Amino acid sequence: ELVAFIWDYYVRHPEFVTILATENLHQGQHARKSQNLKALSGEAVGVLRPIIEAGQAKGLFRDDIDITHAYLMIASLCYFYNSNRHTLSSFLAVDLADKQAKADWLVFISDLALRGLRR
């Protein structure tokens, strides 16, 4: 499942989350200069496109889905938890680094993403 793939990538590569956060602090100045970034973003959205289109062909997913919006929804739900887990753990008095907490969040966001795409 795509949600699990993106989630697992962020969990296994916390350095990537840190790089994204740092790059955003610098207002994307290095990302704008990257020759490879557009190709990478095309691949990320490209992975999602056949999944969405297959779901639409089967009548499972809405016909009005914007692929970019769907990707942003999934990536946002995965990124926010991982990039803010330290402060949110303190704020919510919950250990968001706990294995079960992460598993529960993945189940929740997978369900949420499907609800957003289904007819």
Regions found by a protein language model. Give the residues of each.
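Membrane-interface starts of transmembrane alpha-helices
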Residues: 67-68
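C-terminal peripheral helix-coil segments that are non-catalytic and often amphipathic
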Residues: 5-8, 12, 42-61, 73-119
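Amphipathic alpha-helical linker/stalk segments
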Residues: 1-2, 32-41
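Short secondary-structure capping/turn micro-motifs that flank functional sites
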Residues: 26, 71-72
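Amphipathic alpha-helical segments used for helix-helix packing
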Residues: 12-35, 84-91
